[in-house]
Amino acid sequence: MAAAEEEDGGPEGPNRERGGAGATFECNICLETAREAVVSVCGHLYCWPCLHQWLETRPERQECPVCKAGISREKVVPLYGRGSQKPQDPRLKTPPRPQGQRPAPESRGGFQPFGDTGGFHFSFGVGAFPFGFFTTVFNAHEPFRRGTGVDLGQGHPASSWQDSLFLFLAIFFFFWLLSI
């Protein structure tokens, strides 16, 4: 019966991952065969690139991903085994930093009643002259855009009827404020 267990990969069989000459160990982060294996003082095994990335992304809370014990570069031990081609300490080299990717800016097409500022903004004026309101209404922050026919995304030129309507409402509101 014991011979049958050994042939089919039972608890003591040659197909067990933890036993035999071809034993491999799994990283507790990526769950793959550990490359440049290191062991934490709490006994958990990791790939050094995986653990390095784990530590770099959480600099204020450096804890073991498995048991949440304290962990750092100094609290891991590199593993060396028979047939290891790299006898150097994997902690001394760090994986290369990933390349940055710049996403394309989002287009905010359509009607934008307060210019291209991304929304309405408030400014305080002195006395009866709220200068922030006038600069928002008359687009003083973009003096050269008016009348140039710049396309805002969906075929609406910058000097459309919507600008005139908004200007009329602003002037009406201003005179209403003066009459109060």
From Swiss-Prot:
Domain of life of the native organism: Eukaryota
Biological process, per Gene Ontology: endoplasmic reticulum mannose trimming; ERAD pathway; negative regulation of autophagy; protein catabolic process; protein destabilization; protein K48-linked ubiquitination; protein K63-linked ubiquitination; regulation of autophagosome assembly
EC number(s) on file: 2.3.2.27
Membrane-related topology note: Multi-pass membrane protein
Residue list for modification Phosphothreonine: T94
SMART domains named among the record's database cross-references: RING
This protein's name: E3 ubiquitin-protein ligase RNF5
Taxonomic source organism: Homo sapiens (Human)
Lineage: Eukaryota, Metazoa, Chordata, Craniata, Vertebrata
